[in-house]
Amino acid sequence: MHNYLDFEKPISDLEGKIHELKKLASEDESIDTSDEVGRLEIRVRESMADIYSKLNAWQKTQVARHPQRPHFVDYAKALFTEFTPLAGDRKFSEDAAIQAGFARFRGQPVAVLGQEKGNDTKSRLKHNFGSARPEGYRKAIRILEMADRFQLPVITLVDTAGAYPGVGAEERGQAEAIARSTEMCLGLKVPIISVVIGEGGSGGAIAIAVGNRVYMLEHSIYSVISPEGAASILWRDSTRAKEAATNMKITAEDLKGLGIIDGIIPEPLGGAHRDPQTVIAAAGDVISNALGELSSRSGEQLRSDRRQKFLNMGRNL
């Protein structure tokens, strides 16, 4: 069952009619609905193309949060072989919001990490909806340290509304853990490729997204705070989230124009959730090309380029 967003009502209506016609034909073989179904399918594609060519920032936010959008585990299964997950931060506990380990990417050994939101109630609770606690970022630091030691490229897949803001997380040093993870990314002498596959929220995202190359899926978002949070701070009114999203410049197109990201990975018509295999394959090709481009650079150059890239953002924006 497809979950339709509020602006997709024309698509929902048309696909509802298609479903009814197909059901009618299946119940009575004497009824041929193929011509009408074909016409409606053309109208669906036309309607989808029209709607998705004009999405505003708030609508893209809704697409980025779509519950059926492919998550870290979907990318991990499709892009990597011999994935060996690691658990625990060796200080306090395990945090399933961040998944991390080692794998082969098209035959090349790599370190992989990213946030996992989960896809049903049980898994969402297990992964804390992708909002990591300090233990998650300290686990990420463990993986990053080992990647540097064994000279393995790092691939990060970002999908979080932000780090978990609970009292316990703050007591155990949430801000420090995020800062240390960011610092670790800046210091590595191996390539780091980061892809925002859904939401890239605040320090919780950038803690694992300080890459030599940073990409975003076409309908993903990347921001210092959620639109609802920004609206609450600026206007004391979270219902103005749509206005905040527009002003915050959080879309892939906005951030590419500002020089924050290096490229945009196109999504299938209707969003990544409509055709996960296609968008995952496209992301894999972009990652592969980036690794090929960076493989000839020395460790010192990779580290220097990465630091300069992020320093320039602060100086020029």
Swiss-Prot record:
UniProt keyword Nucleotide-binding, yes or no: yes
Catalytic activity: N(6)-carboxybiotinyl-L-lysyl-[protein] + acetyl-CoA = N(6)-biotinyl-L-lysyl-[protein] + malonyl-CoA
Domain of life: Bacteria
Protein purpose: Component of the acetyl coenzyme A carboxylase (ACC) complex. First, biotin carboxylase catalyzes the carboxylation of biotin on its carrier protein (BCCP) and then the CO(2) group is transferred by the carboxyltransferase to acetyl-CoA to form malonyl-CoA.
EC number, UniProt record: 2.1.3.15
Chain segments annotated as transmembrane: none
Cross-referenced Pfam families: ACCA
Cellular compartments per GO CC: acetyl-CoA carboxylase complex
Domain CoA carboxyltransferase C-terminal stretches: 43-293
Pathway this chain belongs to: Lipid metabolism; malonyl-CoA biosynthesis; malonyl-CoA from acetyl-CoA: step 1/1
The keyword Phosphoprotein is annotated on this UniProt entry: no
Principal location: cytoplasm
Name of protein: Acetyl-coenzyme A carboxylase carboxyl transferase subunit alpha
Listed InterPro entries: Acetyl_CoA_COase_a_su, ClpP/crotonase-like_dom_sf, COA_CT_C
Keywords: ATP-binding, Cytoplasm, Fatty acid biosynthesis, Fatty acid metabolism, Lipid biosynthesis, Lipid metabolism, Nucleotide-binding, Transferase
HAMAP family: AcetylCoA_CT_alpha
Location within or outside the cell: Cytoplasm
GO biological process, one term: fatty acid biosynthetic process
Gene Ontology MF annotations: acetyl-CoA carboxylase activity; ATP binding; carboxyl- or carbamoyltransferase activity
Subunit composition and interactions: Acetyl-CoA carboxylase is a heterohexamer composed of biotin carboxyl carrier protein (AccB), biotin carboxylase (AccC) and two subunits each of ACCase subunit alpha (AccA) and ACCase subunit beta (AccD).
Family, per entry: Belongs to the AccA family.
